[in-house]
């Protein structure tokens, strides 16, 4: 089910009673104030209402021990929710970074390599190396507490994470744009379903 954005925390609690897990999708930049920084000029559109809503859903899911799968913005918002921070603009803040923002006309085309920790849950699904699409200009700077980086690009930018308890996992790319052509990515969604079915 799609959960509508709301500023009413009690509604978030009602929504969470109806689901066994969360998928947090892509979207706008996260307001830098949530990780203690002022915005740089390259920050794009932000939506504080959506930020607060996502943080509340994450808080409730963690409290209720329900699984969470984050995609792109979802990857970043999970890191911030766990106390981490972000590079607000990789091209201007990370010297030597590769291109992480490909043409939007090629959403189903893998453009860079991600090296995975084969011992991690996501590594067991995706293998040691995987090529992914990429549509982001922000990325993890300081890792949130209780999270582990399990996949990165050659420039060191994190691309996949898991929580220590295994209930949270996220990727910086967009597997929903890839799985028709590259079925291995369906395994990420299967993992969420499998974890949710145990609740």
Label each region the model flagged.
Residues 27-30:
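Short glycine-rich anion-binding loops that position phosphate/pyrophosphate groups of nucleotides
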Residues 34-35, 44, 62, 82, ...:
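Ubiquitous "structural anchor" signal
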């Amino acid at each position: 089910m799609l959960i509508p954005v709301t500023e009413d925390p009690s509604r978030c609690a009602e929504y969470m009673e109806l689901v066994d897990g969360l998928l947090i999708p892509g979207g706008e930049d996260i307001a830098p104030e949530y990780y203690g920084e002022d915005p740089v000029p390259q920050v794009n559109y932000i939506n504080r209402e959506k930020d607060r809503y996502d943080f509340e859903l994450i808080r409730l899911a963690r409290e209720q021990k329900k699984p969470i799968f984050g995609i792109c913005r979802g990857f970043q918002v999970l890191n911030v929710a766990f106390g981490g921070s972000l590079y607000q603009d990789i091209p201007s803040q990370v010297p030597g970074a590769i291109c992480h923002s490909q043409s939007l006309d090629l959403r189903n085309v893998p453009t860079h390599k991600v090296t995975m920790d084969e011992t991690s849950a996501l590594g067991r699904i995706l293998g040691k190396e995987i090529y992914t699409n990429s549509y982001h200009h922000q990325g993890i700077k300081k890792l949130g507490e209780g999270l582990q980086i399990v996949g990165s690009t050659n420039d060191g930018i994190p691309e996949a994470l898991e929580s220590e308890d295994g209930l949270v996992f996220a990727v910086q790319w967009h597997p929903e744009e890839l799985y028709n052509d590259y079925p291995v990515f369906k395994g990420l969604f299967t993992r969420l379903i499998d974890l949710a079915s145990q609740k």
